[in-house]
A protein has these predicted regions:
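A general structural signal for well-ordered alpha-helical segments in protein cores
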Residues: 8, 26-29, 53, 122, ...
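Glycine-rich cofactor phosphate-binding loops and adjacent beta1-alpha1 units
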Residues: 36, 79, 83-158
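Glycine-rich phosphate/adenylate-binding loop and adjacent beta-alpha elements
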Residues: 1-8
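C-terminal hydrophobic helical "lid"/dimerization subdomain
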Residues: 123-127, 168-219
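Mid-domain Rossmann-like dinucleotide-binding core that forms the NAD(H)/NADP(H) cofactor-binding site
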Residues: 15-94
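Residues in the short beta-alpha loop(s) of Rossmann-like NAD(P)-binding domains
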Residues: 73-74, 141, 167
Length: 219
């Protein structure tokens, strides 16, 4: 098929097609991160340790965040988060997160990046956000989901609630990061599978929990 040249981006000789396939999600994350006001002194909480959450951990590190906390219930994803640059991981099901953070000397979160897309985790993001913080609603909710919030809490803490939609003008920057190996997209891909394995992967949570799959229809 023919594609407009403005939509074509060149992979480096050292970048595989599998790595190149990750450019779009990295670009989306970059757009969201640009809106988060992260500075070298920032403490960042990422909620959700799937592929998007792990990309956000890496990008927050590249942005210079001082502390990067990953909240994720699956142990293997927490371990991956530490490898990707998180300074601390927490289990939202079994940990008392405010008490754990206080015990670690973390008393204010400047940026919360919500990557799970659940009403419960959006409420949690607002609850854990510090004074004058940014809450980035990045995770995709269902269209008819509703979230009960306490407006006074947002008012009292002067929270900015933001949302990010797709990837305007960040595709080339994302590919530059991948080409330069400044961001690791390969470690998050657990397997490259043929099309006939797709139904099995989608139907089994234990397979999906292993990480991100790339489907190669010609394999």
């Amino acid at each position: 098929c023919a594609v407009n040249e403005s939509q074509v981006y060149k992979l480096a000789d050292t970048t595989s097609f599998e790595e190149g396939a990750m450019t779009e999600p990295v670009a989306c994350c970059l757009h969201g991160l640009d809106m988060c006001n992260i500075t070298p002194a920032s403490t960042v909480l990422v909620i959700g340790g799937g592929m998007i959450g792990l990309l956000m951990v890496q990008l927050a590190k590249l942005a210079g965040a001082h502390e990067i906390i990953l909240s994720e219930p699956v142990a293997v994803k927490r371990e991956m988060g530490l490898k990707m640059g998180a300074t601390l991981t927490v289990d939202p099901i079994n940990d008392n997160i405010p008490a754990l953070l206080a015990d670690k000397g973390i008393h204010r979160i400047n940026t919360v990046i919500e990557c799970a897309g659940l009403p419960a985790t959006i409420k949690q993001a607002i609850s854990l956000a510090g004074n004058k913080s940014v809450v980035m609603m990045f995770g995709l909710t269902k269209p008819d989901d509703e979230v009960a919030i306490k407006p006074f809490e947002i008012f009292q803490k002067e929270i900015e609630i933001k949302a990010s939609f797709i990837n305007p003008y960040t595709q080339q920057r994302a590919l530059d990061l991948i080409n330069s190996k400044k961001i690791d997209v390969s470690s998050m891909v657990c397997d490259i599978c043929s099309l006939d394995k797709l139904a099995d992967i989608l139907s089994k949570p234990e397979l999906r929990n292993k990480g991100k799959y790339i489907i190669n229809p010609w394999q």
